């Protein structure tokens, strides 16, 4: 099974409440493709829902090191930091997410002209 299929299966498992299965599939995906941003993004969300906040933060930051301009990752990091009680970190991540959102909006506006 390729990384994309494994991530899709993991997301389905997660949506069905099978968190451990989703975590395993996503870990397997990252073994196969350690730089898969999609797998890291999904894994950070699964870990957060499992109350594995430190692990979720670690994976999310790893994904951001690969894709620093990924809006959804920055929003995820803010959510993780809120859960962790890191108000300053959450505010910083939220500010970065806001800027990334504006950049995306500007890029979309430029494409529509």
Which sequence ranges carry the predicted segments?
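Alpha-helical segment of the N-proximal tetratricopeptide repeat
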Residues: 2-32
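Terminal, low-structured helical/coil segments at or just beyond the last alpha-helical repeat
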Residues: 3, 82-113
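Structural signature of tandem alpha-helical TPR/SEL1-like repeats
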Residues: 15-25, 50-62, 85-96
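Amphipathic alpha-helical segments of tetratricopeptide repeats
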Residues: 31, 65, 98-99
